């Protein structure tokens, strides 16, 4: 229900002081549209609108228009972070996918929207096709994308792999802002997000009590994470 979503968003942003909330996916339903609009109307009145985000897709103008119409001004664009996802799911070449992404980014910028990007399946991309990941990043780094969000989509990484892959990203793209998006398939989400922070990651995606997508994301342990910030001030949650 839209009012329930608004209540949760208010709790997260005002009481728990969460930095950002991704409140919906674009194009899901009229009910989701109404909920996002209600949240954005409330957030705008409290100068919190830049902290409200919506997941969007590489679909031309469709997701951007949907999100913009709700009043939201931040799109988290879902891109393919592995060659396997690009070729088998989209059935496109890397060049075609990059061209499609850049087109959406340009259009979102024309609407005065902030763009973050997910590199979906980034973990397997780094394991199996790192040259694809770097090729994609090389192209996207030329834009004004604000955050690059690196998901362990299937929850297959261990902390040592997170350290290795995150350090490679930070070393190659020192000016980029990287978020890490863990999944908890093998009960490693918390250890993996700590490894990401130690490796230079600047943002973490978490959920209340670990509830979330599929096997769950990393639990949001607010006070512990805030203490971590004192030691690693570059990180945001």
What does each of the following model-derived ranges do?
Residues 33-45, 126-143, 166-170:
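Short, electropositive alpha-helical surface patch
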Residues 17-43, 79-92, 120-125, 149-160, ...:
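Glycine-rich, proline-tolerant flexible connector loops at the mouths of alpha/beta enzymes
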Residues 60-67, 128, 132-136, 186-201:
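Catalytic cores of alpha/beta
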Residues 20, 25, 45-116, 121-133:
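Active-site beta->alpha loop and helix N-cap motifs at the rims of alpha/beta catalytic domains
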């Amino acid at each position: 229900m839209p009012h329930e979503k608004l209540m949760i968003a208010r709790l997260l942003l005002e009481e728990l002081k969460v930095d950002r909330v991704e409140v919906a996916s674009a194009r899901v339903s009229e009910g989701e549209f109404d909920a996002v609009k209600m949240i954005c109307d409330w957030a705008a009145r409290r100068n919190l609108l830049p902290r409200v985000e919506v997941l969007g897709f590489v679909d031309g103008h469709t997701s951007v228009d949907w999100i913009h119409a709700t009043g939201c001004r931040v799109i988290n664009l879902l891109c393919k972070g592995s060659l396997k996802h690009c070729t088998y799911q989209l059935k496109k070449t890397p060049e075609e996918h990059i061209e499609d992404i850049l087109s959406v980014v340009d259009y979102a910028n024309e609407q005065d929207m902030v763009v973050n990007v997910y590199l979906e399946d980034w973990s397997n991309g780094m394991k199996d096709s790192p040259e694809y990941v770097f090729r994609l990043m090389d192209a996207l780094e030329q834009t004004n994308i604000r955050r690059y969000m690196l998901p362990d989509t299937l929850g297959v990484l261990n902390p040592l792999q997170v350290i290795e892959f995150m350090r490679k990203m930070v070393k190659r793209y020192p000016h980029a802002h990287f978020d890490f998006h863990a999944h908890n398939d093998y009960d490693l989400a918390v250890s993996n997000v700590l490894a990401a922070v130690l490796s230079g990651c600047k943002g973490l995606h978490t959920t209340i009590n670990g509830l979330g997508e599929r096997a769950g994301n990393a639990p949001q342990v607010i006070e512990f994470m805030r203490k971590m910030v004192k030691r690693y001030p570059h990180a945001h949650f």
